């Protein structure tokens, strides 16, 4: 039986503390936990087909999404389309501003309001998952065609049950859940496409618009979007939930954050305004460092000719023959004591220029960002990095400014 990703990630983290930044974890497989080396390898090595490729019957609609594409030409073409959607300019996009106003302000904040004088115990994970789905489907299709999971808890519960069956149900139950998810996403795609008129003008940073505009078939569009929805539902909600959890525990961090946020106004607030707040940015970086949801190792293959790992990395030159599987565990990278002293401690101050040198590690705060490998790197790194940071930043601001 294969070792679960979370267990393997922890085993690698433990091994690194004893053996160094290059650890052999199989007959022809090594794990590297030096960030600069990982970036080099992930930028130049190919995906390992046996890990990424799925049988056609397991693919949504029988079509591969960007993540599962192993052929460079095919992957590059799809990535170009999505890179334009998820570029930094989304921060000033009118479409994204409309999505933020509708999903975050009109739906999320109202959902989170608690009557004055009442104390309420609430499971925030489902709320954050519902928010992420509403936000991402609105981003993909515009708010008019998004899910309404924040307001329709019964439909969201049904959606979550499909995902549970897909991942952990019997073969028959998983097959049925896959069919229901495909129909659900395809219905949204068709509804959005039916709304397009002959004079329709492309909407900047609207995912469905970009995919249809590039000439993709409806099944290809639906497969790509469904992969986005399922991935974001799991990963972003973890960051959001742990943000609330850690701030509830570390009340002094919460108070300092709110004090900084009070310097801004909700009116005409831009993402750049938030990015200029040092402690706000530090909190987000520390949450992503300490709570890495992505445990899978995303392996790569050493190409023909092999590769020499420099002596400066592991103390001796190490040759990796062609065909060697190379992986990196984000958790191990984020718990590197040389870069992040007391790595198990939640300490946002480490990211500030004014940090105590004894606790800041070898890297300066700006350099530390290079060691934050939450989104991976290279041509196969997370294409939606800017979207994820935007969503996390906006949600964190509204939750804290509203003192929820």
UniProtKB/Swiss-Prot annotation:
Pfam families: p450. This is Cytochrome P450 monooxygenase avaI. Keywords: Heme, Iron, Metal-binding, Monooxygenase, Oxidoreductase. Its cofactor is heme. It comes from Aspergillus versicolor. Cytochrome P450 monooxygenase; part of the cluster that mediates the biosynthesis of a highly modified cyclo-arginine-tryptophan dipeptide (cRW). The first step of the pathway is perfornmed by the arginine-containing cyclodipeptide synthase (RCPDS) avaA that acts as the scaffold-generating enzyme and is responsible for formation of the cyclo-Arg-Trp (cRW) diketopiperazine. AvaB then acts as a multifunctional flavoenzyme that is responsible for generating the cyclo-Arg-formylkynurenine DKP, which can be deformylated by avaC. InterPro entries: Cyt_P450, Cyt_P450_CS, Cyt_P450_E_grp-IV, Cyt_P450_sf, Cytochrome_P450_monoxygenase. The keyword Oxidoreductase applies. The keyword Cell cycle does not apply. PROSITE patterns: CYTOCHROME_P450. GO terms for biological process: secondary metabolite biosynthetic process. It comes from the Eukaryota. PANTHER family: CYTOCHROME P450, CYTOCHROME P450 12A4, MITOCHONDRIAL-RELATED. SUPFAM superfamilies: Cytochrome P450. The gene is avaI. Belongs to the cytochrome P450 family. Pathway: Secondary metabolite biosynthesis. Heme binds at residue 382. GO terms for molecular function: heme binding; iron ion binding; monooxygenase activity; oxidoreductase activity, acting on paired donors, with incorporation or reduction of molecular oxygen.
């Amino acid at each position: 039986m294969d070792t679960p990703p979370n267990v393997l990630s922890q085993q690698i983290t433990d091994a690194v503390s004893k053996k160094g930044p290059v650890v052999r974890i199989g007959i022809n497989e090594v794990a590297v936990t030096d960030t600069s080396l990982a970036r080099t390898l992930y930028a130049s090595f190919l995906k390992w087909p046996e890990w990424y490729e799925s049988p056609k019957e397991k693919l949504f609609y029988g079509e591969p999404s960007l993540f599962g594409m192993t052929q460079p030409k095919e992957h590059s073409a799809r990535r170009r389309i999505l890179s334009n959607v998820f570029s930094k300019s989304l921060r000033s996009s009118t479409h994204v501003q409309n999505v933020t106003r509708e999903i975050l302000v009109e739906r999320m904040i109202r959902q989170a309001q608690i009557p004055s004088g009442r104390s309420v115990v609430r499971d925030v994970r489902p709320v954050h998952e519902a928010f992420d789905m509403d936000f991402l489907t609105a981003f993909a299709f515009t708010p008019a065609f998004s899910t309404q999971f924040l307001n329709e808890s019964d439909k969201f519960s049904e959606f979550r049950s499909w995902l549970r069956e897909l991942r952990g149900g019997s073969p028959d139950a998983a097959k049925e859940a896959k069919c229901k998810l495909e129909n659900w996403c395809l219905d949204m795609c068709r509804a959005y496409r039916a709304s397009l008129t002959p004079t329709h003008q492309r909407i900047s940073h609207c995912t469905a618009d970009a995919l249809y505009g590039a000439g993709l078939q409806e099944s290809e569009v639906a497969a790509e979007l469904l992969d986005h929805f399922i991935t974001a539902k799991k990963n972003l909600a973890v960051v959001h939930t742990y943000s609330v959890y850690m701030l509830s525990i570390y009340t002094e961090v919460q108070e300092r954050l709110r004090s900084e946020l009070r310097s801004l106004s909700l009116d005409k607030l831009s993402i750049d305004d938030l990015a200029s707040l040092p402690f706000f940015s530090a909190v987000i970086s520390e949450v992503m460092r300490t709570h890495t949801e992505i445990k899978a190792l995303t392996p790569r293959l050493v190409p023909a000719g092999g590769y020499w790992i420099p002596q400066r990395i592991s103390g001796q030159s190490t040759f990796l023959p062609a065909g060697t599987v190379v992986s990196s565990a984000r958790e191990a990278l984020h718990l590197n004591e040389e870069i992040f002293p007391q790595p198990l401690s939640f300490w946002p101050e480490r990211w500030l220029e004014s940090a105590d040198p004894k606790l800041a590690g070898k890297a300066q705060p700006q350099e530390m960002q290079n060691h934050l490998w939450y989104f991976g790197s290279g041509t196969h790194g997370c294409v939606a990095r800017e979207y994820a940071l935007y969503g996390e930043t906006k949600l964190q601001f509204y939750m804290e400014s509203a003192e929820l």
